[in-house]
Amino acid sequence: MTPDPKRVLDAGEVRERLAGGLPGWSLDDDGIHRTIRTAGWKASLMVTTTIGHLAEVAWHHPDLRVSWGEVEVTLISHDVGGVTERDLALATRIDEVVGWRPGDEDGPFTGTPDDPRFAYLPPPGD
């Protein structure tokens, strides 16, 4: 049975889900949050546009705060006043797409060069 995408999850459920697969996300009264570090202004805009595309095709829109070197993301289902499966699903998709590092996997893509002039996202762990 598919969970009701509009059911508000209790705080314990949300924290458990964040701990089980969404590192970097946290919960407070305003929803779930993550700050994505970037390599600068252009990279922040690219991350914002990427999240905007994902949100639009999902028809579920986050609050974003964009600055040099980071993008803050807040997800909450405003129509029901809490965090739902939709928020967790979009957070997962954001992490998958924005965090994709093709140079770290065996495949046809090399990823961005190590040269900081071409940096998009900081190296993992930075």
Please give the residue ranges for each predicted region:
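Long, contiguous binding/interaction regions
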Residues: M1-K42, M46-D126
